[in-house]
């Protein structure tokens, strides 16, 4: 059984036992989080929400909080000596999907 959930402005396909990276959640490590915005439930029969599947949720456990690798944003204007360099590290949360409830 799989589900497509909405978290952090993105849609993610998940299955039980899978470990995924999502945008940073306000939850402690080893705590349980519930994703209530389930768009599609798949398996033997597929349930498509309009826009959400009623009564469905995905339960997950927070494994760790971390930050992604640094990216460099560089702006410049040719021949004008205009240069701007900025770095960014996006925070994320790693979670393990425990169960999908329909």
UniProtKB/Swiss-Prot annotation:
GO terms for biological process: translation. GO terms for molecular function: rRNA binding; structural constituent of ribosome. Signal peptide: none annotated. InterPro entries: bL21-like (IPR028909), bL21-like_sf (IPR036164), Ribosomal_bL21 (IPR001787), Ribosomal_bL21_CS (IPR018258). Pfam families: Ribosomal_L21p (PF00829). Belongs to the bacterial ribosomal protein bL21 family. This protein binds to 23S rRNA in the presence of protein L20. Part of the 50S ribosomal subunit. Contacts protein L20. This is Large ribosomal subunit protein bL21.
